[in-house]
């Protein structure tokens, strides 16, 4: 447990030492009005860091028994969700929250359903790796073992040197999470029919209803989320979200706020089911009616669903740059 705490502190506090990679990164062309995402203090982007993060994201080496990778919970074809109500960890313990998609996470500072302080991708990545409530990847206290595993791999030795030139102490949690965070920031999705102005008439009608019925008061902005935590009247959580305390058990007497959850993005929402914080809504319509039945009593549901489907970016779901890395180790980047 102590090792896990030290690791989380490292991910939060040592990012100022991680910004020395080559300044060779260029963001892709973004839609009009969308600025490049701000980077947390001390972080940077580079092609080498992204390549390392991509390989780590798809490698079960980051889990206790080598059975779970980040990509097992975040599946590209499903908008980087997993198609399950909640995910089972390496010890068989069931998760408590539905896995969210990852489209455009570079622009977000609220990264979990209820988090109270995990505002960077680097800090958030520590929760699935080292969290104990629930156990996901099961690496709590295994700092030295993680470094040993990665250092024993010739490809990782080379990729870490390229991503963090000048570093002499090998792989650390801080560098692992910096690389994964860099890769996740490349997961940009602005190619849906909605973005391209290619919505069919039924979807356009649904968009008007979406705005008129008040949905856009919370599902606002380019990613259809205000990033805030709201009372939505779905179901009170039975236990604290692990992200509230970095995956550690909550303090004695802690009671989670009833029924308050962060507004999820609606990007690619049609493929990220089952829906809501607990994954207990098997369809988008059931999720809508579960938390907004009164507001939408007169809505044309087929039109609203057509609009939500128009937020699906098919290119994002198949873009090979977000998929598994080549089996062979890449040459110099």
Whereabouts are the PLM-identified features?
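Positively charged n-region of N-terminal signal peptides that target proteins for export
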Residues: 1-4
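Short glycine/threonine-rich turn/loop motifs
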Residues: 22-127, 193-290, 296-297, 317-333
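Sec/Tat signal peptide C-region and signal peptidase I cleavage site
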Residues: 18-20
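Low-complexity, flexible helical/coil segments
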Residues: 107-109, 136-141, 252-254, 300-304
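Bacterial N-terminal signal peptides
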Residues: 7-16
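A gly/proline- and charged-residue-enriched helix-loop-helix capping module
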Residues: 132-139, 149
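C-terminal capping alpha-helices of c-type cytochrome domains
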Residues: 143-190, 280-333
